[in-house]
A protein has these predicted regions:
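Glycine-rich flexible loops
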Residues: 1-166
């Protein structure tokens, strides 16, 4: 897929996420690998109003190559890609219901959601709860790395999900 098409796809996905109420305001971010780096939604962007030309393009050390300044949570995406090299995309949201689950008392941090359906078990397996870190705290990347090798989805306490896929 061309970088131009990938940029359009990120914007379409962002709009879909926003229209379904899974993101509001300037919350959440989406990234995808391209031939010579990766694309990420810019800092402060609204997923419902993304501009393909303004997406951030970064190298594999997190250095901005072109576009607007990247989300301050770029390090989360990079941590997922480093641990899950076969995955081509990462989505991080602050969706209301997932944040609500992330603050519940008495949940099993090894698997925060019970296996409600067979499909959930087949697709997700278990969903670990990553302890709370302040937004932008680089220690969060290391905490995510600790789970990402075995899980393509994690739930950040008081924050929201990070999911890697193709």
């Amino acid at each position: 897929m061309s970088e131009s098409q990938l940029r359009e796809d990120i914007c379409r996905l962002g709009a879909s996420i926003y229209e379904r109420g899974l993101a509001h305001g300037s919350t959440g971010n989406v990234s995808a690998k391209c031939d010579d780096g990766w694309l990420l939604t810019p800092t402060g962007s609204n997923l419902g109003r993304l501009d393909p030309a303004r997406l951030s393009k970064l190298d594999w050390k997190g250095k901005l190559l072109s576009g607007d300044a990247p989300s301050k949570e770029a390090f989360l995406h990079l941590a997922m890609y480093e641990e899950r090299a076969k995955n081509a995309a990462v989505v991080h949201l602050h969706s209301t219901h997932s944040v609500a689950v992330s603050v519940l008392e008495g949940v099993d941090p090894a698997d925060v959601l019970p296996p409600l359906t067979a499909y959930y078990v087949m697709r997700i397996g278990s969903l670990p709860l990553v302890p709370y870190y302040a937004p932008g705290d680089m220690a969060l990347a290391q905490a995510v790395r600790g789970f990402a090798g075995k899980h393509h989805a994690v739930l950040l306490a008081n924050h929201g999900p990070v999911v890697a896929g193709s």
